[in-house]
């Protein structure tokens, strides 16, 4: 049977939506990690695992009962991480990383919506292009990169981009 061509408009909209979500989530996470500990940042980031099915409820998905048990454990874990002595201490960095977990959950739901409607590789390429271009614009607005820094960092940035994004988000 011949495969029906996929709509280009849907692929572009999907890539833009996925790229926007990935950019926002990554930016919140990277900025938040500068203001919290690595352990807290790692734990809080993984809350996207619980947040994804919970957010899915708002678009008509059913969450398995185990999700609610895991959500209680996750909240308890976050509480234990954030209690400092006798006071509850949630830093701005913790909140930014929590925001990133929320947006990563949205990112997964957006991918889940568009991936059956489009070519996954093209969707991923558009997503990475959006994230890369928006992040580069942000770097030039908020940083003062020199030509020497760009050249010396090109190989590590390409390596990290291809492996962590290209492989990690595409496979």
Located regions from the model:
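Hydrophobic alpha-helical transmembrane segments of multi-pass integral membrane proteins
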Residues: 1, 13, 67-73, 92-96, ...
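Specific transmembrane alpha-helical segments of multi-pass solute transporters/efflux pumps
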Residues: 2-45, 80, 161-171
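Hydrophobic transmembrane alpha-helices of multi-pass small-molecule transport proteins
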Residues: 18, 63-83, 101-104, 135
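Residues that mark transmembrane-helix kinks and helix-interface sites
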Residues: 26-30, 50-53, 82, 104-109, ...
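Structural signature of hydrophobic alpha-helical transmembrane segments
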Residues: 30-48, 91-103, 152-162
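Hydrophobic/aromatic residues within transmembrane alpha-helices
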Residues: 32, 37, 58-63, 114, ...
């Amino acid at each position: 049977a011949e495969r029906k061509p996929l709509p280009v408009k849907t692929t572009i909209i999907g890539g833009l939506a996925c790229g926007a979500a990935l950019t926002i989530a990554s930016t919140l996470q990277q900025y938040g990690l500068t203001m919290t500990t690595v352990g807290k940042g790692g734990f809080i980031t993984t809350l996207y695992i619980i947040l994804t099915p919970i957010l899915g409820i708002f678009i008509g998905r059913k969450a398995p009962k185990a999700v609610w048990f895991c959500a209680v454990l996750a909240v308890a874990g976050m509480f234990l991480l954030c209690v400092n002595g006798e006071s509850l201490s949630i830093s701005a960095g913790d909140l930014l990383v929590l925001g990133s977990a929320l947006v990563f959950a949205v990112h997964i739901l957006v991918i889940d919506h568009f991936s059956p409607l489009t070519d996954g590789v093209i969707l991923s390429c558009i997503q990475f292009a959006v994230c890369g271009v928006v992040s580069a614009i942000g770097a030039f607005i908020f940083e003062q990169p020199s030509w020497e820094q760009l050249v010396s960092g090109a190989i590590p940035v390409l390596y990290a981009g291809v492996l962590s994004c290209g492989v990690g988000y595409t496979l």
